[in-house]
Amino acid sequence: MKLDPKPGTREFDQRVRVMSFYREAELHGARLLLVMHKHLRDPDSQMKLTRHLADEARHAFLWTKRISDMGGTLHNIIDGYQHRLGLRFGVPKDTIDLLALTSVAESRALERYQSHAKQEGVDENTLEVLRAVSGDEKWHLAWVDAKMREIAKDRGDEERANRATERVRAIEREVWATFVAEEAELMRLAT
């Protein structure tokens, strides 16, 4: 069984930094959901948004706890992935844009968590957190995509959901490429 790296080592600091980025993304996602609560007022959406918000807060807690259990200290992340995506995307024009932004960010989170879980040498405690958050992300994607398509259909423009999602994806790919390049450079400098 893989053990946690020793505090003070480069490997330890890198893991804590990555987990701090995950935590920040979950908190940023929770803030976005609070905005959505004001726009989606029907009872079904309110129920799903509240569950989704609870999941995001729990995910942030799981990453906080994992870092603490390792003996680490949270990194203050001020320029994380979701922050960058939000700056680049700008203010969503309507609920469909808000849902598309959420869908694309959730999709990236799921991909990132699944990729991390497949890496060699991931310890069991971190795998446990990765599995827990990945399971929730699948439900988040399903309900957000369904709601976005429902709203587009109700507005008489079913393709609007696809256009909004593709617009966000194009922006997200640019943001992600920059983020990954900077992360690789940080990891290179740390070794």
Regions found by a protein language model. Give the residues of each.
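Non-heme di-metal
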Residues: M1-T191
